């Protein structure tokens, strides 16, 4: 899996980390190519030792609704209903696991993840609604401006109408967002088989009482700031640094989500 550059996602991600007072929202959207090379090919061969690439694996029912995709199609009376709607091939499962590994490395390893920790979502509409409700409940009106920008960027990158959508719903022991203070989280994969690409949308809400800046990936910024402060401590740089930080805080704009 290779992370693909996307300037629109980078701009949106800068707005997906926001403090709401009671909680902190930390989110990101990333695009990955499913074309395997090097380590991916080696890992895929090992993965396929447990079953051939096209063998179907059972998935868990989706959490965005009370119906699985297969039951939904049956309830709607569709002639093309498929009893395999709640399954995916081992190759697709590998793509999902490899995306998690690439996105969360080096902090987490998902190589032992199993198919029951994933779900296939019933429809794009339900997923969009679930994401919008989570983000709107967290940041309210601030999300309205970001909402169309976010989904337009995702659609341009992955062509949502062609996607199968999966979610990662692990148990507490495996959940990278299962730490103390976690209020909610979601991990969605928008998989376009034709483009051989996955857009991964991950977001979580952390209680303000347990949140630390490093959880949002700011540890390096803090270290660099400390080094600069040490270098300037002899010439009044500390005071200038404090003024600069104050200005940055005043200019910071709350993140907007849809």
Swiss-Prot record:
The lineage of its organism: Eukaryota, Metazoa, Chordata, Craniata, Vertebrata. The gene is Maf1. Plays a role in the repression of RNA polymerase III-mediated transcription in response to changing nutritional, environmental and cellular stress conditions to balance the production of highly abundant tRNAs, 5S rRNA, and other small non-coding RNAs with cell growth and maintenance. Also plays a key role in cell fate determination by promoting mesorderm induction and adipocyte differentiation. Mechanistically, associates with the RNA polymerase III clamp and thereby impairs its recruitment to the complex made of the promoter DNA, TBP and the initiation factor TFIIIB. The keyword Phosphoprotein applies. This is Repressor of RNA polymerase III transcription MAF1 homolog. Residues 58-85, 226-253 are annotated as: Disordered. Residues 61-76 have a biased composition (Polar residues). InterPro entries: Maf1 (IPR015257), Maf1_sf (IPR038564). Belongs to the MAF1 family. Disulfide bonds: none annotated. Coiled coil: none annotated. Its main location: nucleus. Pfam families: Maf1 (PF09174). The modification Phosphothreonine is found at residues 64, 212. Phosphorylated at Ser-60, Ser-68 and Ser-75; the major sites of phosphorylation. Nuclear accumulation correlates with a concomitant dephosphorylation. Phosphorylation may attenuate its RNA polymerase III-repressive function. The modification Phosphoserine is found at residues 60, 65, 68, 70, 75, 214. It comes from Mus musculus. Residues 240-253 have a biased composition (Basic and acidic residues). It is found in: Nucleus; Cytoplasm. GO terms for biological process: negative regulation of transcription by RNA polymerase I; negative regulation of transcription by RNA polymerase III. GO terms for molecular function: GABA receptor binding; RNA polymerase III type 1 promoter sequence-specific DNA binding; RNA polymerase III type 2 promoter sequence-specific DNA binding; RNA polymerase III type 3 promoter sequence-specific DNA binding. The keyword Plastid does not apply. One of its GO terms (cellular component) is nucleoplasm. There is a cross-link at residue 35 (Glycyl lysine isopeptide (Lys-Gly) (interchain with G-Cter in SUMO1 and SUMO2)).
């Amino acid at each position: 899996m290779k992370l693909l550059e996307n300037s629109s996602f980078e701009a949106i991600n800068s707005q997906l980390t926001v403090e709401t007072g009671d909680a902190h929202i930390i989110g990101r959207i990333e695009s990955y190519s499913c074309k395997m090379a090097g380590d991916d090919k080696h890992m895929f061969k090992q993965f396929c030792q447990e079953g051939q690439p096209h063998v179907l694996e059972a998935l868990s029912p989706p959490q965005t609704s009370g119906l699985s995709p297969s039951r939904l199609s049956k309830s709607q009376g569709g002639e093309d209903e498929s009893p395999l709607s709640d399954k995916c091939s081992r190759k697709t499962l590998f793509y999902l696991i490899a995306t998690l590994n690439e996105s969360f490395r080096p902090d987490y390893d998902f190589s032992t993840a199993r198919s029951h920790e994933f779900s296939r979502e019933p429809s794009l509409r339900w997923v969009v609604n679930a994401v919008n409700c989570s983000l709107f409940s967290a940041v309210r009106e601030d999300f309205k401006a970001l909402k169309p920008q976010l989904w337009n960027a995702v659609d341009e990158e992955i062509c949502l109408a062609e996607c199968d959508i999966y979610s990662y719903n692990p148990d507490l022991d495996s959940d990278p967002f299962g730490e103390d203070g976690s209020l909610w989280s979601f991990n969605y994969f928008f998989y376009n088989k034709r483009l051989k690409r996955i857009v991964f949308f991950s977001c979580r809400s952390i209680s303000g009482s347990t949140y630390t800046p490093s959880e949002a990936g700011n540890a390096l910024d803090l270290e660099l700031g400390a080094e600069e402060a040490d270098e300037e401590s002899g010439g009044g740089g500390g005071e200038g640094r404090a003024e600069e930080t104050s200005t940055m805080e005043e200019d910071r704009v709350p993140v907007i989500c849809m």
